[in-house]
From Swiss-Prot:
EC number(s) stated in the UniProt entry for this protein: 7.1.1.-
Species this protein is from: Syntrophobacter fumaroxidans (strain DSM 10017 / MPOB)
Predominant subcellular localization, coarse grouping: membrane
Reaction(s) catalysed (UniProt annotation): a quinone + NADH + 5 H(+)(in) = a quinol + NAD(+) + 4 H(+)(out)
Molecular functions (GO terms): NADH dehydrogenase (ubiquinone) activity; NADH:ubiquinone reductase (non-electrogenic) activity; quinone binding
Entry-linked Pfam families: Oxidored_q4
EC top class, as a word: translocase
Gene this chain is encoded by: nuoA
Protein name: NADH-quinone oxidoreductase subunit A
Length: 136
């Protein structure tokens, strides 16, 4: 099946596909033009001053490359995990009446599994902020 027939008309489903293809080409062209303009107008020779970190107009004192403590990463990962779980629970709450008791049982199992995971992380010390040398 050809997108455009010999008489110049489109089949019923093909105008949407044709519009999608035209849109994709236009977006790709726009992105390419923006990247080219940024490259063309951009700084060619960055010096030491340009590479220095900017701290609100104040001359930096010390290195800007500091290491973050690992608990911050762990809290971020736990937040993402439990945030996604919250999204699942919210969608379940919206469709609660249609799902009935079967959906309630499935969500209860899901929440129970989440609680088991939270207790596991807690017991392994993932929520403890003390330094590792001070743990008992």
């Amino acid at each position: 099946m050809q997108p455009i027939s010999p008489d110049g008309s489109l089949s019923p489903w093909e105008p949407g596909m044709f519009s999608l293809a035209v849109y994709a080409v236009l977006v790709a062209a726009f992105v390419a033009v923006q990247l080219f303009v940024a490259w063309w107008l951009g700084e060619r020779k960055p010096g030491v001053e340009k590479a220095r970190p900017y701290e609100c107009g104040i001359i930096p004192t010390g290195s800007a490359r500091l290491r973050y403590p690992v608990p911050f990463y762990l809290v971020a990962i736990f937040f993402l995990i439990f945030d996604m779980e919250g999204a699942y629970i919210l969608t379940w709450a919206v469709a609660f009446e249609e799902l009935g008791w079967a959906g309630w049982l499935q969500m209860s199992f899901f929440i129970g599994l989440l609680l088991v995971g939270l207790v596991y992380v807690w017991k392994k010390g993932g929520l403890d902020w003390r330094p590792s040398y001070g743990k008992k």
